[in-house]
Structures are given as structure tokens and as C-alpha cells.
Amino acid sequence: MVKKNRNGMPLVPAGSCRDFFLHIEEKRLEEAQGLLQETLRGVADVVPVKILLDGGFFGKKAPSKRLKDRIGNLAVLPHRGEGVFWWFEKHRLEQHFYAAHGGLTPEEMESIFLFTEI
């Protein structure tokens, strides 16, 4: 179901625990979306990346070729207070920050810039 690299190994997800992008075989995209929606009901939204790209979730400009080539085709977007991990090691890959870049909560969608003289 997951696309493979040239060595036959599954492609690892892109993004973070707050915006998780999978590389799914096109012919199995709907199947994967349905399976994940059922499994993650109440925890995360599962959305084809095309909907996010077409909806301007990555900005007003057209997404770059590099982004489209690397991002994957199925997004898992955890709800407030949730996260998704494909690999976890205690004390190494723990998420301690709320509002990590990438989520869809208002706090994560807003960027705050502070300029100060150094």
C-alpha cells in the first residue's frame, strides 16, 4: 500500500506529528484513506494532499515542484492535543511543544513574528 523507494523499501512519512504525510500507491489511495479514517476517528482527519494543495493550505502561491514531489499524497492531520507518530523512542522522539508547525488549530495556523533590535 505504501510506495517503495528504488531499493524496495517503504517510503518514510514526511512532515511531523502534527502534519503527517504518507506516500501511498495511487491505486490504493482511497482504500488507505478509508482505513485510516476508521482507525483514527476522533483523533485525526485523513485528507488527500491534492485537496490541501488545491485549497491553498500551503500559501497563496502555486506549490513548488519540489514540495509536490516530496510531500506524499495522503495527509493525517491530528486534532487538538493529538499527535501521530510512525516511529517513537522514549526521550528521543517525544513531542513536548504545543502548536508545533503544521497543525490546523488556530494557534498553529497563525505565525507570529517579533522583530527586535540586537
Placement of each model-derived feature along the sequence:
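Feature captures the catalytic ectodomains and active-site-proximal regions of enzymes
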Residues: 1-118
